[in-house]
Amino acid sequence: MPRLPSLQGGNTYRVVTDTFRGYSHNLKLAEGELYDTTNLTTDYYPLLASRKKRGVQAALTKPGGLLEKDALCYVANGTLYVNSLPTSLTGLSDGEKQLVSMGAYICVFPDKKYYNTENSSDYGSMEADWSLTGSVTYTPCDVDGVPYTNFVVSASQPDNPANGTYWLDQDNKIVMMYSSSLGVWTEVATVYTKVTFSSQGQVPALFKEGDGVEITGLAVDDLNGTKYLYGVGGATSTTDDYIVLVGIVEGSITYSSTVRLQRKLPAMDFVIECQNRLWGCRYGYDSTLHETINEVYCSALGDFKNWRQYQGLSTDSWAASVGSDGQWTGAINYLGHPTFFKENRIHTITVSATGGHRLDETVCRGVQKGSAKSLCVVGETLYYKSRTDVCAWQGGFPTGVSAALGDQTFTNAVGGAFGTKYYLSMKDSSNLWHLFVYDTAKGLWIREDNLHVMQFAKVGAELWCIDANNKLTAMYGSTGTAESTLSWSMETGILYYEYPDNKYLSRYDIRLNMEANATAKIYMEYDSTGGWIDSGTIARTGTGTVVIPIRPRRCDHLRMKIAGTGAVKVFSIARTLEVGSDV
């Protein structure tokens, strides 16, 4: 009798995943990678686990900046707060701030204000501006402001001069001093003028010896312009305040004029601290100079108030023009070097002990415009968001580290560093926000949630942030009001594309640990239909293996999602699969 054809049984496979390799938003994933995650962490790698709950410390009013010092510092509603307490520095303008730490001081930009965290009475403006319309007296003096008592002004040498007589040669505009022991006149190398006026003590309160200032309105033209104050003070009465400048006047004279003294800071796009100076950069049109400027600056050594102190000393302030075109996009102190970024440049300054600082240029991926706050040092590596990817930089050329984020376009990145982790909040092309975490030690990315972070700051054993809802949050939950419920999820990529035949998924074995009242649900999607099918629920406490039977369904490919609440650790996921024919 004829033999009938026999049907061959399908091949059954058991696939176990016990190493979870983080987030990878790509079409093809390696074993253990996840296409999407919510509120998971790499802390327990190779396990998959939910992150710690965050703690909300406060809801702020008009927050404007965040700074990491010994205590958390921030601006809210126009006031600087240190360790959650308001300081005397109030009246700050609305909007985003750059808070820069220099020693015990906090410098606030663009307001150009400062506050001393060790002396609460020491605060105010970095700039100073004073003017007077009235009588001003000019007197030749020494560097200490002591007037010359025997000063002769003439076109020829005085007859029978006494020892120590000063003579202003009107023809040559030089000052000579007579020595009776040598019988000769010797030129005085530097001549000073004491400028005395009535300021009611305002000038000594606003300015100090060593300030670099802009002076206008003095009757002696040589005393106007950018000047160095060799002395500032007041006589026995506050109506007789004075400054000491380099310059020559023909004896003690008094004029009536309108005088103005200004100590000014340049307008700067970004400001950082490095090697006991503040450094800044500026690109844009200067309405005073009527030209576009493209410059970097630094303050005088140890003096954040002085940016126009030019005495030929190693401690002077400094400025340099830059040839590369385009706006500045960020700045950071990287390994003791002031480092400034454009979208296609990295400019690094080598600080010199002699004051001859050197500006170097590297043509490469720089910081994306709007992502200045993505700059973070983790370990000794600098991370930042470029126009195309997330970069790691160690002084040579940047290396991309964000292939796992897929081909999405992100902007407005804000970064934070905690331990070996790089936190990065940024917006995608659909205007949705994402908080990613890159574990630099393990080389793994994870996506936490949609938190829109305005600024990060690490203080002690906590990473703080201010979000778009003005909440001051402890990311590791060490303080504040903890989240009531932590929802988490993981989603695989497309599974079993390597098998061309149709297949059946019959069961899942999931080994996990769950805290009390934690739950988890399993969902399946078949053949990219876009719909998730509820395939089982897990509700248990402690560690154990849960078997989830799946109703067999023939498909070409599939995806799986696990979503739940509460603290969970997943040790492994085993899948039983039967591969059939291609029909």
Per-region residue spans from a language model:
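Short hydrophobic/aromatic-rich beta-strand motifs
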Residues: L72-C73, A104-V108, P158-M177, G210-I215, ...
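Small/polar beta-strand repeat architecture
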Residues: G9, M126, L132, V143-D144, ...
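Structural motif
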Residues: G78-Y81, Y114-S120, D286-G302, N344-T350, ...
